[in-house]
Structures are given as structure tokens and as C-alpha cells.
Amino acid sequence: MTEFIFLDLDDTILDFHRAERIALAKALREFGVEPTDSVLSRYHVINQQHWQRLERGELTRDQVQEGRFRVLFAELGKDTNAAAVTRCYERNLGIGHYFLPGARETVERLSGHYRLFLASNGTASVQHSRLTSAGLYPYFEKVFISEEIGFNKPSREFFDACFARIPGFEREKAIMVGDSLTSDILGGIRSGLRTCWLNPNHLPVRPEITPDFVIESLPQLEGLL
């Protein structure tokens, strides 16, 4: 029996890639860089590398947020204030929210039958802004953001801190749902939760990180609970 559902936000409920693309293009142009396909592609590689290092505990959040732009602009041979670029990017990202197909309706239906909790590794100010503009707060009992918790997914410390804040929490009645194997699914497994991987692109499952369920879109979750 499922009672507690932990949901990731980016690319689980909201289309982060679309919001990111728009915010990134605006920030780059403001600081003199044309957001060509090659520039955007290189940014995504650098960004992914930085977030993976955060998950492994090798970088702090500030080092990720500014470091990705510092590396990108250095590769482009341009001097810039990485902190200023970061502020511009996050300001634009915070006002962008685009729901994935069926996600809003699914969250609304689930909230009537289960206790929903948001579990995000995103930047607190950005995520709170997006949650507000998307009108998602009423559906969640609590919102857990790593920057405020003090630990990042997939660490057990992140999930343990979440569990401690939930009255009457029962681990065996909980499930973690998200699009990231290395963050959402690995974190859920480490913390003794059932896990559901949102995998719209049909990526291969890694043998060392095996979710209990795999779905292509969030509405499919309802049939598994």
C-alpha cells in the first residue's frame, strides 16, 4: 500500500530543458555570447559534469552554479563575471514553468489520494519561484529542496532529513519518483524506498541502479500504486 509519494520536479513534473534553454539563451546574449547549437551543447556537457560532481560530494552548489559559466566563457575566450551570469540565468529560469504532458493533472489527482512531497536538488530561490508561478504548492504537503535541507540527493542524509519532517512517516509505504537514475532512483534505493524511474527516452537501465518500476510519462504512475 502506498501512502507517501516523493516527486522530483525538473523533467518529472516540469519541462526543465525547455525552461533552461530559454533562460540560458537570454543570459548568454546579455553577456555577449550568441547561443548557437554548439555553444548550448557544450554548456550542457559542462553543466552535467558539474552536477554529477555535486552528487558525488566533490563540489558545493555555489561552485556548480558559477563554475559551469566560468568554464564555458573561458573556453570561448571571453572574460566575464560568472556570478553575474548566474544571477541573470537564474532570474530568467525562475519565471519559466512548462508542464510535461499530463503532469499537472496527474499531480492534482494524486494529491486527493496520497500524501505528496516534492524532493528537488534545484536551487531554492529558483524552485520556489517556479513552484509559485506553476501553482503547484497546494498539491504538496511539504517541499524539500536540497539547498535548504543541507544535503543533496542521492545521499541518505537528504532523505533521512525529509523523513524526520513528515509526521507518521512509514518507509514501507513510500515511493520515490523521478527522471534521474543517479539522483532520484539511487537515492530512493539507498534510503529503502520503492522507486519509479520516469524514462521517456527509453534509456538503458544500469545494472547497479535498478528501479522497481519504469514509466514513460507521469500519468502511468497512477496504474502502479
Please provide the spans of the model-predicted regions.
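Catalytic-core regions built around general acid/base machinery
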Residues: 102-113
